[in-house]
Each structure stands twice: as structure tokens, then as C-alpha cells.
């Protein structure tokens, strides 16, 4: 993409050289602007409207050029509300695309789509900025090696492992522990990989964004006393904002993540909540830009817009961006163009189950519904693959037997099936784990469990070596040795009670 360089001559301010246009037409968030001949801005250039409204209030609206209409007119989408704008107002072409602050100074802070801090903690202490529209890494720069991204969370690492530099879809309703899982991943990547995280709130509720910020401060993911030691940068474009902001806030978050990957050479975790809202915002402005709607009223450029975002999320030889994207499925229709286009880019899916959450098993990741393209013998090795398959088989058999148990009871099952049920219940409880970020609420210290320890633990349960231990011993522990210790403690407690 070409940029419009602004040259500076001695004694002449750069603002005077920038071309100035005037607003011709305003339709919601879309503006038509006329510029002098030969002074047209480039596609994606940022335009600024600075003026005063009829009540003499300051107006400062940033727009992004989307189309060149001919006759020296351009069509732009506003990044904030267009209230108070009038035809004839002056519009300044900045000569560059929207650029946002990047680097360590962004950690612990909250930004809007323009990269302006909105947390009342003063300006950001950095001079480094990146444009939000950047090319995806060249093919030669990509790291093609398939490697597992260890999270330290047993159920994820064993049954639906994440790919380093991959894209993961997070499916879950309200109140099943999505926020806590997100915060634990942010915490673990910082501790185990020395990495940082960027959270992009795309079209989410303002209340949820505020709750997440407060919980992050409470759990230590954001360090209030020493903000530089925080592990995450937050970028919000909430539901109440115009579609222009919601359409671009994902790119703002991604740009901040790219700096950590390309310049700081770090492993970065990028959260996008919700990727559906990114598509929805594009669909809102598409008709106003004069495009013919496609299937189900979505924009005809849906695949291109999704691809331009997703292709930038990848591993290079310098570092990686691993992305976890919350996916809303409208009316539970997986064939809807928005989720269907998203699925094409995902390497793994993590499904949170309300049934498990109601049993008190956290993280409430459904072991049978969650999937990963990485769970193949040639990638994870035979030992990991076979253990995962046997765990799934045991849980699947338990699921099939539950109706029989509910009607006839456990005693009517064969000896083999009773053993399967006992082991499945132990596996189900062993898939739970105390989280570091939940220490504040539970009082139990968090546990990071390495992949080798996870595999060993499930192998011991499947082999029958631990059939003698009570199933409570496997609930909310880290590795398998802790389960054995907990069993001894439970036995001693029961003796004391007697």
C-alpha cells in the first residue's frame, strides 16, 4: 500500500502542506469529502475533522478513507460518533494511515481504536508507532515447523493442544469460566514463555470490558503499583461505538502484538473477543459504502477482510502470535457465513461446557467437543496421541452408560463397565486444575503442569495403578503425585473423624 509522504520545508509547518477537503455528505458513520484536484488522499489514509458544533463544543473526529469516488471525492468511515458534523466542515488529510503506539509502554494500559489511552492514567510513554494496516509476513519469513504451544493447562495440552502461532476458537456461553481461562493463559504465557498478551475487545459489552480489567488487576495480571510489570495490553472498541471503530479495533490490537513479535522477538498471545463482531461491523458499513450485499446480508468482501486479519496472525522466525478468538455463533447456525469463514482459519477449538461447570469442574473445557489439528501422532508423538485417544474413549463410554446408570443404577453394569465408569470419573476430576488467577477466590495455590507430567498422570489412571484411590483425590490437583498425596491426607482425615 502506498503512503502519502509529507515533506517539510524550512519555515513551513507540515500541517499547512497537508491537503484540506470539505464534507459533502454525511450518512451515519460514512462521510463523502471533496478535495482540491491532485490532492486526493490514498486509500486507508487517516483524515481528521477538527471544528466546533452549534453548541460551541470541540469536535475531533478521525476517519479512514475507504473509496475514491471520482470527481475529487472520497468516501471515509468515521472512527467515532459523527454527531455535530455538518456539510462544509474542513477535513485534513494526515498523509498516513491510522498509527497506534507500540512497545512495552502499552502493557497494563487500555486503548481505543486510535491508540489513545482511555484509562485516565495519562499519556503513553513511547514514541514508537506502527500503522494498523500492514502486510502479512512474507512466506520466506514464516516458521513452518509445527510445534505445540504448551499452556500448562492439562485438559488443553492433552486433548486439544494449541499450535505455536496458531488460531484457536473459544466457544462458551456466559458464566462458564471463559474470562478465568483467558486470564490463566495470559498468566501462564508470561511465566513459562516470557511472553506478553494483547486483548482486543471487539464489540463487546462495556461492563464485560470493565469487569475483565478489574479482575486482571485483582489477580495481578495487571500490576497497578508497577505498571511496567503488567503482562497484557488492552484495546477496546465496545458495542456502543460506531461500526468504524469496531471494524478496526482488531487491527489495532494485532498491530501492538506484531511489535512484540517482530521487534522484541517474543511469543505473544492475542485475544479477540468477539471475532463475529468484527464481521458484523464490516457488514454495517458495507451497504453505506455502496456495496451489493452477499449471502445473509453480509459484505461481499467478507472472506478478504477476514483473511487480511487472520494472515497476519502467524509464527515467524523471530517470534509468534498465537491467537485465541471467542466465536459467537448466531442462532447456533454453524453454516452462517460469519462463523463458517472463521472456522476455515482455526487450528483448534476449545469448547466450554455448562454441564461441567455445574459439576464444579474447572476449567470447564469439554474433552469430547474440543478439537485440534495438532493431535496427530506425527506431530505430538505416539505416546501423547494414544493417551489422548484412550482418555476420549473412556469418557465417551462413560457418557453412553450414563442413561443406563440413571435408570438401573451402577450395580446392573458389567464388571468391565463399572471399572470404566470409575476410571472415567477419576479422569473427569483430574482434568480439573487450580488456577493461579483464581487463588484470590479459591484459596488454593495455582498449578502449572508440564505436558510430560500430564501424559504420565493419565497413563497411570488408565493403566489401573490408581484404582484404589478415591475419586475426590483427583479433584483440583496439579500433577498425579499430588493426587496420591491428597488420597493419603483424605484417609488420615477420615480416621481422625472416626
Curated annotation (Swiss-Prot):
Main enzyme class: translocase
Entry-linked Gene3D superfamilies: 2.40.10.170, Bovine Mitochondrial F1-atpase, Atp Synthase Beta Chain, Chain D, domain 3, P-loop containing nucleotide triphosphate hydrolases
InterPro entries with a match to the protein in the record: AAA+_ATPase, ATP-synt_VA_C, ATP_synth_F1_bsu, ATPase_a/bsu_AS, ATPase_alpha/beta_chains, ATPase_F1/V1/A1_a/bsu_N, ATPase_F1/V1/A1_a/bsu_N_sf, ATPase_F1/V1/A1_a/bsu_nucl-bd
Any one GO CC term of the record: mitochondrion
Disulfide feature: none
Subcellular locations according to the entry: Plastid, Chloroplast thylakoid membrane
Residues annotated to bind ATP: 172-179
GO BP, sorted A to Z: proton motive force-driven mitochondrial ATP synthesis
Entry-linked SMART domains: AAA
Membrane disposition: Peripheral membrane protein
GO molecular function, one term: ATP binding
The reaction(s) this protein catalyses: ATP + H2O + 4 H(+)(in) = ADP + phosphate + 5 H(+)(out)
A UniProt-annotated Pfam family: ATP-synt_VA_C
SUPFAM superfamilies linked to this entry: C-terminal domain of alpha and beta subunits of F1 ATP synthase, N-terminal domain of alpha and beta subunits of F1 ATP synthase, P-loop containing nucleoside triphosphate hydrolases
This enzyme's EC code(s): 7.1.2.2
Source organism, top-level taxon: Eukaryota
NCBIfam families: atpD
Family: Belongs to the ATPase alpha/beta chains family.
Biological function: Produces ATP from ADP in the presence of a proton gradient across the membrane. The catalytic sites are hosted primarily by the beta subunits.
Self-association state and partner proteins as the record states: F-type ATPases have 2 components, CF(1) - the catalytic core - and CF(0) - the membrane proton channel. CF(1) has five subunits: alpha(3), beta(3), gamma(1), delta(1), epsilon(1). CF(0) has four main subunits: a(1), b(1), b'(1) and c(9-12).
Name of this chain's protein: ATP synthase subunit beta, chloroplastic
The species this protein was found in: Sorghum bicolor
Amino acid at each position: 500500500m502506498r503512503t502519502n509522504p509529507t515533506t517539510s520545508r524550512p519555515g513551513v509547518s507540515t500541517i499547512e502542506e497537508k491537503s484540506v477537503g470539505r464534507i459533502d455528505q454525511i450518512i451515519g458513520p460514512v462521510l463523502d469529502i471533496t478535495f482540491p484536484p491532485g490532492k486526493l488522499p490514498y486509500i486507508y489514509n487517516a483524515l481528521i475533522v477538527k471544528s466546533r458544533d452549534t453548541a460551541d463544543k470541540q469536535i475531533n473526529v478521525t476517519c479512514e478513507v475507504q473509496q475514491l469516488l471520482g470527481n475529487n471525492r472520497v468516501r471515509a468511515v468515521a472512527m467515532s460518533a459523527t454527531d455535530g458534523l455538518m456539510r462544509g466542515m474542513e477535513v485534513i488529510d494526515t498523509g498516513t494511515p491510522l498509527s497506534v503506539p507500540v512497545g512495552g509502554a502499552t502493557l497494563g494500559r487500555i486503548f481505543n481504536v486510535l491508540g489513545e489511552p482511555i484509562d485516565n492514567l495519562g499519556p503513553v510513554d513511547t514514541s514508537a508507532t506502527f500503522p494498523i494496516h500492514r502486510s502479512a509476513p512474507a512466506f520466506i519469513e514464516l516458521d513452518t515447523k509445527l510445534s505445540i504451544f504448551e499452556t500448562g493447562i492439562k485438559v488443553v495440552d492433552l486433548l486439544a493442544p494449541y499450535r505455536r502461532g496458531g488460531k484457536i476458537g473459544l466457544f462458551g456461553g456466559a458464566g462458564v469460566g471463559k474470562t478465568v481461562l483467558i486470564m490463566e493463559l495470559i498468566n501462564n504465557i508470561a511465566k513459562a514463555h516470557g511472553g506478553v498478551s494483547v486483548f482486543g475487545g471487539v464489540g463487546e459489552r462495556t461492563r464485560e470490558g470493565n469487569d475483565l480489567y478489574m479482575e486482571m488487576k485483582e489477580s495481578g495480571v495487571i500490576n497497578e503499583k508497577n505498571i511496567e510489570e503488567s503482562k497484557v495490553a488492552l484495546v477496546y472498541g465496545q458495542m456502543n461505538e460506531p461500526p468504524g471503530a469496531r471494524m478496526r479495533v482488531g487491527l489495532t490490537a494485532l498491530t501492538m502484538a506484531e511489535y512484540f513479535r517482530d521487534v522484541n522477538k517474543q511469543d505473544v498471545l492475542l485475544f479477540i473477543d468477539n471475532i463475529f463482531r468484527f464481521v458484523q461491523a464490516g457488514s454495517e458499513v458495507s451497504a453505506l459504502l455502496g456495496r451489493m450485499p452477499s449471502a445473509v446480508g453480509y459484505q461481499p468482501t467478507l472472506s478478504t477482510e477476514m483473511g487480511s486479519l487472520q494472515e497476519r496472525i502467524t509464527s515467524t522466525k523471530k517470534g509468534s502470535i498465537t491467537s485465541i478468538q471467542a466465536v459467537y455463533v448466531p442462532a447456533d447456525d454453524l453454516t452462517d457465513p460469519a462463523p463458517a469463514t472463521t472456522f476455515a482459519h482455526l487450528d483448534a477449538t476449545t469448547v466450554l461446557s455448562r454441564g461441567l461447570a455445574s459439576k464444579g469442574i474447572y476449567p470447564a473445557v469439554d474433552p469430547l467437543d474440543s478439537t485440534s489439528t495438532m493431535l496427530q501422532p506425527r506431530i505430538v508423538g505416539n505416546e501423547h496421541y494414544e493417551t489422548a485417544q484412550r482418555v476420549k474413549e473412556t469418557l465417551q463410554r462413560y457418557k453412553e452408560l450414563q442413561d443406563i446408570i440413571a435408570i438401573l443404577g451402577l450395580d446392573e453394569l458389567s464388571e468391565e463397565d463399572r471399572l470404566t465408569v470409575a476410571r472415567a470419573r477419576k479422569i473427569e476430576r483430574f482434568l480439573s486444575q487450580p488456577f493461579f488467577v483464581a487463588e484470590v477466590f479459591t484459596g488454593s495455590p495455582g498449578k502449572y503442569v508440564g505436558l510430560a507430567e500430564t501424559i504420565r498422570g493419565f497413563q497411570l489412571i488408565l493403566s489401573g495403578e490408581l484404582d484404589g484411590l478415591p475419586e475426590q483425590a483427583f479433584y483440583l490437583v496439579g500433577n498425579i503425585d499430588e493426587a496420591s498425596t491428597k488420597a493419603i491426607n483424605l484417609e488420615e482425615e477420615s480416621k481422625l473423624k472416626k
